[in-house]
Amino acid sequence: FDTVFVETVGVGQSETAVHSMVDFFLLIQLAGTGDELQGIKRGIMEMADGIIINKADGDNVDKAQMAAAQFRNALHLFPPTESGWSPKVLTYSGYYNIGVKEIWDMVDEYMAFTKKNGYFEYKRREQAKYWMYESINDTLRDTFYNNPAVSSMLNQTEQQVLGNEITPFIAAKRMMDLFLENISNTKLP
């Protein structure tokens, strides 16, 4: 595919995962909702390569322009991006189809900028490395919890921790020791 869009629910966790798999991270905000700069709290703005204020039409045009100005000002509070790119803030109206060309131009400009300075390839390599380790971690976690010896002792060990009979650290060590003793009985997922 030449272009793939990945939409998230906007609560913070999924954006971190998505950021590690995309070339361009676009934050879409609505004006006039009272939480224009809420993205700062979640750290999402720091990940954004571009920000668009949606529904910049009708009675909302002035609010959208004000929100765009607030975001531009807020971006100055963040350290420079790793790519060297300065994120842009644009307004957009899907209803009137205003701003689409400017958004695509921004994405194209970003891609050209990051390919020229080598960041595009660097980020792709870092993403590949990140997903390799994520896959290893997922496999290790699944292998651990699917181990018959571990699954048979986990609840009992948890109860010992909850009853203050052993510390969480001793419990973890015991469970890891049990896992390592019985790893040959476990199949990879």
Say what each PLM segment does:
Residues G12-S14, G99, I166:
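Gly/Ser/Thr-rich beta-alpha loop segments that engage phosphate groups in nucleotides
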